[in-house]
Amino acid sequence: LNLKNQKLNKVERVQYITGILHDTCRALGKELVVRPFASIEEDYELMTQAYEQISGEMLIMDKWTQFDWSLTLPVNAFFRKIKRNPLLVETDIFGEYFGLGILPIMLREHIQRNFAYCENFDPAGYVSRIDRAGYHAFGDVNEINYRIMEACLEGHDIDLAIDAFFA
């Protein structure tokens, strides 16, 4: 990549490239949603700083578990680095990387715990992954995870949602 000014610092490089994408999207009447894809705190900070400098309205979307999808990884502590921009929380509620939604699994505690944590950051919304490579959980037992997430989002009783699903 040949930049006009090769002396840009890390924040300025992210800002320069993302700014081009942001301006292009705006010119086309579209909205840019950015993903930090950072596993090192310093990188996350510099990326969110660059995004903030471009536009405080640009949506930052990131996973609710830190680094990647896993039932054993911690919640995303980097959310606290997002100061100005709205947050879209990305969730995996069908086991995209641990069973493709094929293995029967109920993620009640995982969904409830991560949802409660994310609500501390007043997210603009949630994006839930519900399939992988054509596999999805609609119409089988794993649809329960969609119903649990739906109950969380709507402030309904999770136990009642589970009971209704299995009734």
What kind of feature is each model-predicted range?
Residues 8-167:
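Substrate-binding groove of N-acetylhexosamine-processing glycoside hydrolases
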Residues 1-8:
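Active-site groove signature of glycoside hydrolases
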